[in-house]
Swiss-Prot record:
Residues 584-596 have a biased composition (Polar residues). It comes from Homo sapiens. Pfam families: ODAD1_CC (PF21773). Residues 650-670 have a biased composition (Low complexity). This is Outer dynein arm-docking complex subunit 1. The gene is ODAD1. Component of the outer dynein arm-docking complex along with ODAD2, ODAD3, ODAD4 and CLXN. Interacts with ODAD3. Interacts with ODAD4; this interaction may facilitate the recruitment and/or attachment of outer dynein arm docking complex proteins, including ODAD1, ODAD3, and ODAD4 to ciliary axonemes. Interacts with DNAH9. Interacts with MNS1. Interacts with PIERCE1 and PIERCE2; the interactions link the outer dynein arms docking complex (ODA-DC) to the internal microtubule inner proteins (MIP) in cilium axoneme.
Length: 670
């Protein structure tokens, strides 16, 4: 029984341990899940996921529409192939029926006349193209000047920022000095107040001591005067004078007594007088009192002498104290004047510092106002131009205001948007049959007055048609090696197409009669129209511009693509669509600022010429990557024009497009 209980308890403990381990494992899993949930619930990632989902949904819809359009185009190509086969069978059957030599000669004459007409048209178009290349070179120089102006503006902006920083530092130092001067001034005021109170107390105390000393001096002077009066000789008594006269009369009469008698009588008279004065008849007591009085008078005399000495000493002390008081008052006045002077100097310095601080503050506020106005204008221009803010959102996050360091980024995006809008405006002017030169100059916002007076002569290209097998790509800006390989392929394909065209013309001259000359021209137009891909709904694909135009009298087809094909999900909220039933359909969608937008021009006649300029206004490196321009056209564009365009892709500086590699002579077309 005990063993079963132990086994059961052991089994229960094992189960509990397993459950605890499972609980810990589940807690770790729960922590990982919470971390993943918090990461998934992050605002930025949710926004990115939502934008990616929207972009994917939009791309899927565009893919379905493109597939439908591809199927329709394949059906159209099959129908056109059937028509071509029918026309070829009809031509072959008709050539079997008609073998007249006059018809063949007439057909040759008409073909030669048609060739001369086309050559004349080609010469005119090549002249326009050469003029456009010259204007493009001039515009590149102007663009370089504008870049230099932009660098100067950035230098001035940096200098102003340094000056503002210096002014901030100067204002802070002035504020510190003014606060320290104010503290020193307050401390000096407190010390002056204490010294003033102390001087007032000392003055009151000295006045009280002077009054006490004056009273003592007055008392001593009165006592001294009294003692002087007392010590003066007494005036003779009238009785004594009378007695002396009486004695003199007795002596003269002979009645004068002896000296003894006279002495006794004198003593008696003296005793009688003393007894009368003192009120004492006993001579012993009278003598004793007299001695006491004499001793007392002598003591008083000694005391008066001592008091006189003390009086002289006190007078000397009073004189010294008065001199010390006068010197103390003079030193106090000097110290007070010195403190007033120091206070005035400090006040002047404080006023000067305050005025300087106010001036610097006013200047700083002025500069700050100009800077805020400039930022507001840049923000307004950025909003009105509908610039792409995805790169700014990625870099700055959730900031809604423009900082001082963000002005260069906003200006670069505005410059990029301006180049795009000018290109779009030039394309619209070209589609509305404006002057070719004006439309070319509008690409960079220039006019005919800005052209140089001296232009170097250029060699015109031999043709403006697309070479067979040329395909425009709008995936990304191609590198130098890719452009070189593509140019080599285009040259080979063009040579093969030229040889095949000559063979076809020779065969057609031998077979065709005079009645099928018009059909031959229409057949050539139909054959050239199958090279490009028409688009029925270009607005369904965001970030691109597709144009398809077929003209019977000109036989031309233009294709223009602006696109921002990047992985960034930030797009402008709106797109612009311009169309014309006669000139083709154009759609301008939003572009992304985080990668190079792509622009492709595919002209085959004089009506579409903008893509053959070979201009690229941006470099591929860095954050400010702008849309590249890929030009595809004739053999001359493949051999020389694209070479110059390749140079533009590799560098932002202007490249010479007037060299011999940009076009070939008319004599080399045979």
């Amino acid at each position: 029984m005990e063993g079963e209980r132990r086994a059961y308890s052991k089994e229960v403990h094992q189960r509990i341990n397993k459950q605890l381990e499972e609980i810990r494992r589940l807690e770790e899993v729960r922590g990982d899940l919470q971390v993943q949930i918090s990461a998934a619930q992050n605002q930025v990632k949710r926004l990115r996921d939502s934008q990616r989902l929207e972009n994917m949904d939009r791309l899927l819809k565009g893919r379905a529409q493109v597939q439908a359009e591809i199927e329709e185009l394949q059906e159209q190509t099959r129908a056109l192939d059937k028509q071509i086969q029918e026309w070829e069978t009809r031509i072959f059957t008709h050539s079997k029926n008609v073998r007249s030599p006059g018809f063949i000669l007439d057909q040759k004459v008409k073909i030669r006349r048609r060739i001369r007409i086309l050559e004349n048209q080609l010469d005119r178009v090549t002249c326009h193209f050469d003029n456009q290349l010259v204007r493009n070179a001039a515009l590149r120089e102007e663009l370089d000047l504008l870049r230099i102006d932009r660098n100067r503006y950035l230098n001035v902006d940096r200098k102003l920022k340094k000056e503002i920083h210096h002014l901030h530092h100067l204002v802070s130092t002035l504020i510190l000095s003014s606060t320290s001067a104010y503290a020193v001034r307050e401390e000096a005021k407190a010390k002056m107040g204490l010294l003033r109170e102390r001087a007032e107390k000392e003055e009151a105390q000295s006045e009280m001591e002077a009054q006490v000393l004056q009273r003592q001096i007055l008392h001593l002077e009165q006592l001294h005067h009294f003692l002087k009066l007392k010590n003066n000789d007494r005036q003779p008594d009238p009785d004594v004078l009378e007695k002396r006269e009486k004695q003199a009369g007795e002596v003269a009469e002979g009645v004068w007594k002896t000296s003894q008698e006279r002495l006794v009588l004198c003593y008696e008279d003296a005793l009688n007088k003393l007894s009368q004065l003192m009120g004492e008849s006993d001579p012993d007591l009278l003598v004793q009192k007299y001695l006491e009085i004499e001793e007392r008078n002598f003591a008083e005399f000694n005391f008066i002498n001592e008091q006189n000495l003390e009086l002289e000493h006190v007078q000397e002390e009073i004189k010294e104290m008065q001199e010390a008081l006068v010197s103390a008052r003079a030193s106090k006045d000097d110290q007070h004047l010195l403190q007033e002077q120091q206070q005035k100097v400090l006040q002047q310095r404080m006023d000067k510092v305050h005025s300087e601080a106010e001036r610097l503050e006013a200047r700083f506020q002025d500069v700050r106002g100009q800077l805020e106005k400039l930022k507001a204008d840049i923000q307004l221009l950025f909003t009105k131009a509908h610039c792409d803010s995805s790169m700014i959102d990625d870099l700055l996050g959730v900031k809604t205001s423009m900082g001082d360091r963000d002005m260069g980024l906003f200006l670069s995006l505005i410059e990029k948007r301006l180049v795009e809008l000018l290109t779009v405006q030039a394309f619209l002017h070209a589609q509305s049959f404006t002057s070719l030169a004006d439309a070319a100059l509008l690409v960079l916002g220039q006019s005919l007055e800005d052209l140089p007076k001296k232009m170097a002569p250029l060699q015109p290209p031999d043709t403006l048609e697309d070479p067979p097998g040329f395909e425009a790509s709008d995936d990304y800006p191609m590198s130098r090696e890719e452009l070189l390989s593509q140019v080599e392929k285009l040259v080979e394909l063009q040579e093969q197409a030229e040889a095949q065209r000559q063979k076809d013309l020779a065969a057609a001259a031998a077979k065709l009669d005079g009645t099928l000359s018009v059909d031959l021209a229409s057949t050539q137009r139909a054959g050239s129209s199958t090279v490009l891909v028409p688009t029925r709904h270009p607005h369904a694909i965001p970030g691109s511009i597709l144009s398809h135009k077929t003209s019977r009298d000109r036989g031309s087809l233009g294709h223009v693509t602006f696109g921002g094909l990047s992985s960034s999900t930030g797009h402008l909220p709106s797109h612009i669509t311009h169309g014309d039933p006669n000139t083709g359909h154009v759609t301008f969608g939003s572009t992304s600022a985080s990668s190079g937008g792509h622009v492709t021009f595919r002209p085959v006649s004089a009506s579409s010429y903008l893509g053959s300029t070979g201009y690229v206004g941006s470099s591929r490196g860095g954050e400010n990557t702008e849309g590249g321009v890929e030009s595809g056209g004739t053999a001359s564009d493949s051999s020389g024009g694209l070479g110059s365009s390749r140079d533009h892709v590799s560098s932002t500086g202007p490249a010479s497009s007037t060299g011999p590699g940009s076009s070939t002579s008319k004599d080399s077309r045979g």
